[in-house]
């Protein structure tokens, strides 16, 4: 499992260097290296962000060669006998980008360029929301509330209740939900698996906190302190990205 060629099953023997650490017993390192039970599975899958970055940094032929030589493709070939291809997955996502006006062949349109710097499970939906103006004209607390529907996923059974149609924040979130439904339909036409839909379940809590409410007032039985902090960090990370790729108005609110 060492080295690119070794991982792909080309080399019979590989060499690895393991950095010494006072916190890791040497016996544990030996056990991992000699184990016959350790299975490495690639989680490598093309995302819209990856497609966008390949488009701006590689030719189409270079991108296809890169994917075809990846460890992920090697494992996929072993599982499916070559019936599935990361290159086809890339082409499918590129087809979605073209259909949505974010790409023209192997070239990003201006509205698709933010994808290069958006790292989110719902990366394309984030950029769709930006392009549709659904994040414009919001104050810091409001943009945090709206952005939270792009990062939050309720744990356990059930889904969050859809927001009421009253109120600007709710209208923006409903707009993003409608965009997501359109995007899912497009992805189905291209055979692209969809991510989880937007979830408004954290919007009220983060808006109250961002507006200055005391944390003890915001936390309820629904949120543990750790879960609240984790979701705050996810929203903060997305806002940091929006501050880099958004319009002047969006960037100003996202930074605050």
State what each model feature region is.
Residues 43-148:
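C-terminal accessory/connector segments of nucleic-acid motor ATPases
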Residues 124-178:
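Leucine-rich, amphipathic alpha-helical/linker segments
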Residues 1-32:
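Conserved segment of the helicase C-terminal RecA-like domain
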Residues 158-256:
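C-terminal amphipathic alpha-helical interaction region
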């Amino acid at each position: 499992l060492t080295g690119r060629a070794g991982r792909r099953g080309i080399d019979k023997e590989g060499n690895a260097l393991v950095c010494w650490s006072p916190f890791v017993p040497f016996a544990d390192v030996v056990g991992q290296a000699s184990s016959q039970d350790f299975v490495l599975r690639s989680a490598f899958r093309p995302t819209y962000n990856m497609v966008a970055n390949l488009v701006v940094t590689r030719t189409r032929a270079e991108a296809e060669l890169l994917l075809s030589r990846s460890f992920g493709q090697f494992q996929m070939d072993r599982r499916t006998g070559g019936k599935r291809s990361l290159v086809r997955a890339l082409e499918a996502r590129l087809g979605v980008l073209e259909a949505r006006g974010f790409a023209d062949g192997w070239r990003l349109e201006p509205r698709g360029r933010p994808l290069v710097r958006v790292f989110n499970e719902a990366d394309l939906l984030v950029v769709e929301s930006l392009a549709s103006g659904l994040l414009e004209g919001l104050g810091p607390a409001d943009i945090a509330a709206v952005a939270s529907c792009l990062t939050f996923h309720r744990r356990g059974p059930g889904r969050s209740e859809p927001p009421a149609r009253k109120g600007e924040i709710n209208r923006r979130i409903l707009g993003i939900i409608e965009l997501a439904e359109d995007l899912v339909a497009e992805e189905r036409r291209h055979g692209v698996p969809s991510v989880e839909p937007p979830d408004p379940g954290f919007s009220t809590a983060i808006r109250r906190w961002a507006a200055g409410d005391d944390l003890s007032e915001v936390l309820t039985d629904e949120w543990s302190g750790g879960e609240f902090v984790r979701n705050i960090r996810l929203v903060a990370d997305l806002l940091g990205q929006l501050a880099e790729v958004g319009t002047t108005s969006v960037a100003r609110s996202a930074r605050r």
